[in-house]
From Swiss-Prot:
Gene name for this UniProt entry: epor
Name of the protein this chain belongs to: Erythropoietin receptor
Organism per entry: Xenopus laevis (African clawed frog)
Top-rank taxon, per record: Eukaryota
Record's subcellular location: Cell membrane
GO terms for cellular component: external side of plasma membrane; membrane; plasma membrane
Amino acid sequence: MGAPSSLLFSTAHWRTVPFLLAFWVLLSTGTAEDPTMTPEFLRHISEKIPEEYQNPHCFTRDLNDFICFWEGERRKNASFSYSEDDQIKWCQLRTEVASNNTWWYICEFPVTDVVLFAGITISAYPCHKCQTAREIYINELVLLNPPLNVTVKEKQDPRGLLISWKPPHFQKNHDINNEIKYQVNYSTPGADMQTVEVEAGNTEIFLTDIVPAAYTVTVRCKADGVSYNGYWSDWTAPITIATIIDLRLLLLLSIAIFVALIAGVGVYIFMRHGMYLKHKVWPQVPTPENNFQGLFTTHKGNFKLWLGQADAYLLWISRHVFQEDPSSTLEVLSELPPAALPQSFNPNPLKDSYVVLDENRMPCSLEWLEAQRHKTVIVGAESMDSRLQTVNKDVVLEDTSKGQIAVKANNRVHSLEGDGSQGEAFREDEYVEAPRMEHERHRVSRENSVSSDGKQSIPSSFEYTELQTCEGLLSPKPRPVPPRMPLKYAYLDMSSSGEHSPPPSPNFYQNSPITNFLAPIYSQS
């Protein structure tokens, strides 16, 4: 029983030896065949690698593997060798059909021979475009996988697209994330592709200046730093996002449309019911303009002028009185000759007769004087003659005949002819003054005084007139029209010595409708 059992044990032991040898060969020569190393994948990698990188092409995807390949003629004696620290090693090649006459020769380095930051010398045969031997560094031939978890979000404040991703995964814990840079492609339908490069270490980008459209975004990466370098990876799967219109712009547009609509409705309502709304919102304030026509336009608010009770003569507009100044009263003083007459010698009243002594000195308002004379011919003459009789008893005027006036003074009779060339004969110390009404103006009289040469000066008086202003208008204070003055006194031109004194200056502020009347001429010794 013992012999057969030992025989079976020895037979089973020898059957497991080939499997152990195969496993040892795999560990010593390399890893198992990579199923991704298809002819299509190798063609894609060869097209991706730039031309400056010569054959054979080598790369590492996760810093844990290293693969070299090239395209050459079909040979059974093809070989690939690499050396590190002057120790040459031969790689077991794997072939894939490239075309009708060429094969892909593939060498996969064992994991134990993948050494970073150390130079490796490689040589391949047959390879017409390959150097006999060249030195490479695995950490400079990195071919990364595309970035992971690419996301695109639309932001409104500020408006734009936020694109983010994660770096590719590595089997070994290598600090390479800070040495990977990225490229982002984005485009809209009908527009050219735009590429933005992101600096190493950043894993997001914010795109501004976007428009409402559908955006397609892709991302790729590349090792580009001090320690690692390599090739651009494949682009990620495209991500499409449709952006909407800017909410702020939409809000502003909505507000503008709403305001325009409200304005249109308001204009329509105002055009249709404007007067009604005006009376409702702003009631009409009562104004006297409707009841006082012309008071505030023609008469400038002067109520007296509007009633017709003010003077209709010259109105003086002061340039120095403003509308905001309060109303004031102005008094004007003027010096006038006295109204006293010498005593009359004739107790009898004078008759109302006159003669024109000088035809060249006619009254300015003869028609008005004639009309007034007919109205008050009796009353005026009697009152004036009676005053002359009571005031002066030394001078008497008598009518001698038609066209003549006799003046009797100091028992001497002087005849005034109708011819103006003969003149009048009076004594130098005698004079006749046309009487003036006492109530015509206010007077401030003064007594007779003696002049510097010893002669007695003529008594004089001061007249003042009150003037009132109303909105810049200055006019004399209104007075009633004085009674008629006998016309004959306006023509008395008497002189005994031939010397005539100049007439007094005209008073422009005298409220009299006969301001153009010739003032009496006085004769004094």
